[in-house]
Amino acid sequence: LFAALRLIEAGYRPVIVERGKNVRDRKLDLAKISREHKVDSESNYSFGEGGAGAYSDGKLYTRSKKRGNAEKILNVFCQHGASVSILQDAHPHIGTDKLPRVIENMRKTILDCGGEVHFGTRMDVLLIEKDTVVGIETNTGKTFRGPVILATGHSARDVYRWLHTHGVEIESKGLAVGVRLEHPSLLIDQIQYHNRNGRGKYLPAAEYSFVQQVEGRGVYSF
């Protein structure tokens, strides 16, 4: 979505090919996973408009030092319905209830500016000429040509197999494994505010994080 908006700024009319469904219809498929244990291989937590983070709690925070123009990203979210508070908060947070609407509004901007969005359309073949990707062929048999941005997320294994089979150089990336740790909010407030009574009536819940190096690897909370 952000790549498409950037292309629009540069005068292009981007075409988004999305193998999953739109952000609203995805909710029905996610409900089936929880209630009926039925998984749609093309519409689930990984595939669909907004990607794997569409139904997260919308935290907008990074420890990376290669952040780029983070302020511009936050402004785009605000322009499409996120609270302006994310521009000032140390740990900006859109919220699970608001994020799908923000994603829909971003799609509307793309369409209003002449872009296209095709749902239920999977890339099956990269069209390569003289070692340059010039387009894609989809599962519907339709071909799209022009500049291609391949944003596969982390679970499109069929894409990686295709790339490997056709000699495209790929390499593995570091994997972070998360576990959930819970601490009583009163305990954290007492520690962070240095007050045995916690935060009192007026202060917000205290923020905290843990960072440690174990055998040369970083362990951190997020």
Predicted feature descriptions by range:
Residues 1-222:
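Residues forming the flavin
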